[in-house]
A protein has these predicted regions:
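Short phosphate-coordinating micro-motif centered on Lys-Gly-acidic
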Residues: 23-25, 71, 108-111, 116-165
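N-terminal pre-Walker A segment at the start of P-loop NTPase domains
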Residues: 21-41
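Hydrophobic anchor at the beta1->P-loop junction of P-loop NTPases
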Residues: 52-54
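P-loop (Walker A) phosphate-binding loop of NTP-binding proteins
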Residues: 57
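Short, positively charged low-complexity motifs
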Residues: 1-4, 20
Length: 165
């Protein structure tokens, strides 16, 4: 895993909100083992009850990352994409991990109530294709192509404020 110089703070403007985001880590992922190591490292940075929005193009490794993270928490079974079921919950010794995929939804806000109920008491929430501000996410994981590899960035997301305030 390599380090790359990136801005440590970034302002994100989406859907009328402006939020301060702080970069917690940036890693180059060249091998599957790099993704597994990233999941274990990210787990150490996330507080209990964290909600992580995961962004990246199709095939970027979002579900693979979630699988490694859930297994690092002690879930022994298979982790699959909830593309059609929308939400999967995995029991772990540290509490349930909720994994959602909003890719197919035209209006993700319709699922927010169900997602909120599933997240109650959860160790961790992981949402693929989720807007951090719409979800109220505490963190954002971005996976992006970088040549033959991928770049993973974990951002801590601050509260959103209306633009112009």
């Amino acid at each position: 895993c390599g380090f790359k110089s990136r801005p440590r703070h970034q302002t994100e403007a989406r859907k009328g909100l402006v939020s301060l985001m702080r970069l917690l880590l940036s890693r180059r992922l060249s091998r599957l083992e790099d993704t597994q190591a990233l999941a274990e490292e990210v787990l150490g940075l996330l507080p209990r009850g964290a909600l992580v929005a995961i962004e990246g193009p199709l095939g970027a490794g979002k579900t693979t990352f979630v699988g490694f993270l859930v297994r690092a928490l002690g879930f022994p079974g298979r982790v699959t994409s909830p593309t059609y079921t929308l939400i999967h919950t995995y029991p772990t010794p540290e509490g349930p991990v909720v994994h959602a995929d909003l890719y197919r939804l035209k209006d993700p806000s319709l699922l927010l109530g169900q997602l909120e109920a599933a997240l109650e008491g959860a160790r961790l929430g992981l949402v693929e294709w989720g807007e951090p501000h719409l979800l109220g996410a505490s963190h954002l994981l971005r996976l992006s192509p970088e040549g033959e590899a991928r770049r993973a960035e974990l951002w801590e997301v601050g509260p959103g404020e209306e633009k112009g305030v």
